[in-house]
Amino acid sequence: MKILVIQGPNLNMLGHRDPRLYGMVTLDQIHEIMQTFVKQGNLDVELEFFQTNFEGEIIDKIQESVGSDYEGIIINPGAFSHTSIAIADAIMLAGKPVIEVHLTNIQAREEFRKNSYTGAACGGVIMGFGPLGYNMALMAMVNILAEMKAFQEAQKNNPNNPINNQK
């Protein structure tokens, strides 16, 4: 299965940006941790990483995933979580599972950070676990996709499914 990991604004500065909140781990290290998690778990997962500081590029990347071989999206939209109805709309149009990740617990931060337009559009949100949150999202995504495939197989093999009885 192929999973797209989208990283939003300022995440390229992890390791330098407010270490009290975000720690010293860099974005490249987070991606390495995710790849190691895939290898150690013998997961049949291919990850593609994309980072941008531009809202429109995030929307473009989500739209490019429609009809592609990406089966799911893990996204940390950064501060766009709190402002971007456009990214939320793109997530809703993606037609695949999307999980939002935040390194910090946005509910414990400033008042303006507590609302997440994008999180409301996602199937789930994982926040406050630092870099571990990405592996938590990855495990959730793998399980969600496996359940979806099992359901689709069951429907395909169900003789009572009217779609299977069409000639």
UniProtKB/Swiss-Prot annotation:
| Record bears the keyword Amino-acid biosynthesis | yes
Q: Which keywords does UniProt give here? A: Amino-acid biosynthesis, Aromatic amino acid biosynthesis, Lyase
What species is this protein from? Answer: Helicobacter pylori (strain ATCC 700392 / 26695) (Campylobacter pylori)
Q: How does it assemble?
A: Homododecamer.
One matching Pfam family: DHquinase_II
Q: What is this protein called?
A: 3-dehydroquinate dehydratase
Record's PANTHER family? CATABOLIC 3-DEHYDROQUINASE
Q: Which domain of life is it from?
A: Bacteria
EC numbers listed for it are 4.2.1.10
Q: Where are the coiled-coil regions? A: none
Annotated catalytic residues: Y22, H102
Annotated residues that bind substrate are located at: N76, H82, D89, L103, T104, R113
Instruction: Give the record's GO biological process terms.
Output: amino acid biosynthetic process; aromatic amino acid family biosynthetic process; chorismate biosynthetic process; quinate catabolic process
Q: Which family does it belong to?
A: Belongs to the type-II 3-dehydroquinase family.
InterPro entries noted in UniProt: DHquinase_II, DHquinase_II_CS, DHquinase_II_sf
| Reactions the enzyme catalyzes | 3-dehydroquinate = 3-dehydroshikimate + H2O
UniProt GO molecular function: 3-dehydroquinate dehydratase activity
Q: What does this protein do?
A: Catalyzes a trans-dehydration via an enolate intermediate.
Q: Where is this site: Transition state stabilizer?
A: R17
List the pathway annotation. Metabolic intermediate biosynthesis; chorismate biosynthesis; chorismate from D-erythrose 4-phosphate and phosphoenolpyruvate: step 3/7
